[in-house]
Amino acid sequence: MLSKYELIKPDIGSSHGNITKVYEIVGGKPLRGQVKVSGSKNAALPVLAASLLCKEPLQLTNLPKILDVTNMIQCMEALGKRFEFINTNTIKIGNREMDTLTIPKEAARQIRASIILLGPLVAQYPKVILPLPGGCSIGKRPIDLHISALNALGVDIVELPDCLVCSRRYARLQGNTINFSIKTVTGTENAMMAAVLAEGTTIINNAAMEPEIVDLANFLNRLGAKINGGGSDRITISGVDKLNSCGSYSIMADRIEAGTYLVAAAMTRGSISVKGVNPDYLVAVLSELKCAGAKITCDSDSIQLDMGEEYGESLNITTKPYPGFPTDLQSLFLSLTCVLRGNSYLCETLFEDRFQIVQELKKMGANISLKDNTAHIKGVSRLRGSQVNATDLRSGAALVCASLAAEGITQIFAIEHIERGYEDLILKLKALGANIKLIENTHVTSTELSDSHFKEATSSETRIQRASLIETIVTPSITTFGQFKRVPTGEVTELEKQQTPYLHHIM
């Protein structure tokens, strides 16, 4: 087997006993130069999942070299896919025969996006058992919307404490109308991937409108799907019998990574050009950067930012589904508002725990108070270096930006969160003039550095991971467990255990 997903596995920052990896950043130097954006994490993961629907070889290019992609590949290899890397960012995907399809539990529990394997799996197999996903600890991200959408297409689902047990009612999924009560990106993606092989027509109302949805629709249509309306709030899908190879497909650029470098340049009073990104996907973000004092100019595939010598006035931001301000950049702009003049307000409407970063920024001298889902920030003249912990992917990136602007030295721990979603972060920042390095074998434990807030965050993540210690199996038999309902483990019948051989291991 020529699969070498370790080629895209980055050096991750983690703690093993007394050995810790950290980012060390000396702040105060403006970022200047050009940076090219990598392929989008949030587009690559659903496109990889969608490749399960095609039994013919195909090739993906512009695949980001990040840990989430590595974990997704590990999951998909266990589901019968064969991966061969042509180069670091290009992968050839094929198939191999499998007697038992079992996802490695370690990979499944590390990645929130494992939930989007459900759509393509139930489209092809009569029964699927999927572990509840892991990922960043940023609050509740209920999967009820995924379940209700698949239920509408003919999937009966029982949610156990550790997994979902899914059974098709019919030999083939049935097209239907899906009405999402709120917008959900991964829920929309799951519904799309399931519906492309369903019998009849599926209409998704209140669909997510993100550019990554458009990218997935484009990929599926290249495979022979019939999807109309991707990028609007109403998507129509006419089911087909099978999908065929498109040859090669290029993953779209990462607009969140682009926003990250723009914020870093703004915070350091720098001047950079971000290449390879469509500025139309960042309209709300660029508007706020202009309000913060940045001069912005755009070409068709690049964005130039010049911050000048002075920070701008305060911001008032509310996160919203696309095309509104993205929640994935909320933490970054929280860092930015710490150094702006005046009082800023940041309201988070999508995730209740996006403010875990506040305690870390306070260590650096930030003046932030929280009330409900809103942060009130009073700008300070300068942040100062400290020892901080990345509690999730985007907060980690935000701490990097804050450290680049701070006076003195900052050490960032738990950098494995950052490496989940950023390709070659250190190399790209160094090319812009940043003083940043990875320090290994530092004999300091995270416990010695963390406060009670971080302990709660890490213990919460541990509980999430512990709850996901179950592998995923696809079995050949059809078993109906009834309509979706939550049931305690003890209510699963002996017959259901026998029909799903793996279930008895988790009872």
From Swiss-Prot:
Transmembrane segments: none annotated. Cell wall formation. Adds enolpyruvyl to UDP-N-acetylglucosamine. Belongs to the EPSP synthase family. MurA subfamily. Its EC number is 2.5.1.7. The active site is at 136 (proton donor). The modification 2-(S-cysteinyl)pyruvic acid O-phosphothioketal is found at residue 136. SUPFAM superfamilies: EPT/RTPC-like (SSF55205). This is UDP-N-acetylglucosamine 1-carboxyvinyltransferase 1. The lineage of its organism: Bacteria, Pseudomonadati, Pseudomonadota, Gammaproteobacteria, Legionellales. One of its GO terms (cellular component) is cytoplasm. It is an enzyme of class 2 (transferase). Keywords: Cell cycle, Cell division, Cell shape, Cell wall biogenesis/degradation, Cytoplasm, Peptidoglycan synthesis, Pyruvate, Transferase. GO terms for molecular function: UDP-N-acetylglucosamine 1-carboxyvinyltransferase activity. Phosphoenolpyruvate binds at residues 41-42. Pathway: Cell wall biogenesis; peptidoglycan biosynthesis. It catalyses: phosphoenolpyruvate + UDP-N-acetyl-alpha-D-glucosamine = UDP-N-acetyl-3-O-(1-carboxyvinyl)-alpha-D-glucosamine + phosphate. One of its GO terms (biological process) is regulation of cell shape. HAMAP family: MurA. It is found in: Cytoplasm. UDP-N-acetyl-alpha-D-glucosamine binds at residues 112, 141-145, 328, 350.
